[in-house]
Amino acid sequence: MLRNRTDAVHDRVRFSIGTRVMSSWSIVVWMFHRQTWQFLLTTGFILCISSIAWSAEVHQMELTHHEFEPWSFVPKPGDRIDIHNHSDIVHAIYVTYPNGIVVNLSETAAQLPGMTVSWTVPEDAEDGDEYVLQCWIHTIIRAALKVKAPLSQLPEP
């Protein structure tokens, strides 16, 4: 029987965990702390794993007049390559895949001066695959990119 409103049922209920007796309020606090730690550990694990998956890089290629400027990167599967048109003429860059598929890098097929187009190396690209960047308008503009797959993606012998 309750004497007044301050005496709540949950304050009088006791639980036994092992040899320790805890009130219901202590259980709630314990569960909250446990859930908080579980959340933090799970979030940390997911961020660690996803940072490995997010290891793709963004590379820059510069297009000036009738040639690509020399580049110093080796593309890996999943890397994005941004191609910036620094010339004062229009270009129309496309990529030829190793299997012969051709992909335009601009919806209009024209890359105006100052415009940047992007291409992402396919995730299923294999070590040694060669992707050729060319211009539809100026066929002399050509760059061959050989993919170097990370060791973790190479098949075991």
UniProtKB/Swiss-Prot annotation:
Protein's pathway: One-carbon metabolism; methylamine degradation
SUPFAM superfamilies listed in its UniProt record: Cupredoxins
Coiled coil: none
Function of the protein: Probably involved in TTQ prosthetic group biosynthesis.
Name of the protein in its database record: Methylamine utilization protein MauL
Originating organism: Methylobacillus flagellatus (strain ATCC 51484 / DSM 6875 / VKM B-1610 / KT)
Recorded name of the encoding gene: mauL
